[in-house]
Design a protein with these regions (language model features):
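Anionic ligand-binding catalytic core segments
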Residues: 1-125
Length: 125
């Protein structure tokens, strides 16, 4: 949601499934679509927060969310890298789906592909 700008992310878009033995699991993803409008009531910022923020996310926010979810060391960053790689392919997906070029350009311009970059690079020795 952060990288591809689905800012209409709210708790009704997250679900769990229970199997016959009573075990819960996260449901397959649904209602995932680009929704960003800086002037919109519901789409100017994210509806759910990450690390207490609804915008201006950083690499540190993603890693903090991973720690909060008790992901193993490095897993949050690996997941973010996978997502960024998929979103980077947006032009190809858009072309395959027949999205008009001006529209896919608008969507692509809003993607956050730099979330894993260090905000303050460490000095070189």
């Amino acid at each position: 949601n952060l990288v591809a700008r689905n800012q209409d992310d709210h708790v009704k878009n997250i679900a769990f499934l229970m199997d016959r033995t009573g075990q819960w699991s996260l449901s397959p993803a649904f209602d995932i679509t680009w929704s960003f409008n800086p002037a919109g009531d519901w789409t100017s910022t994210h509806q759910m927060s990450v690390n207490g923020k609804r915008d201006q996310f950083t690499r540190a926010d993603l890693l903090a969310a991973g720690r909060s979810a008790q992901l193993k060391r490095g897993r949050a960053e690996a997941i973010a890298e996978e997502v960024i790689a998929a979103v980077r392919d947006w032009p190809r997906y858009a072309a395959e789906a027949g999205v008009p070029e001006d529209r896919y350009g608008e969507i692509q311009a809003s993607h956050r592909l730099d979330l894993l970059q260090l905000q303050h690079p460490e000095p070189q020795s």
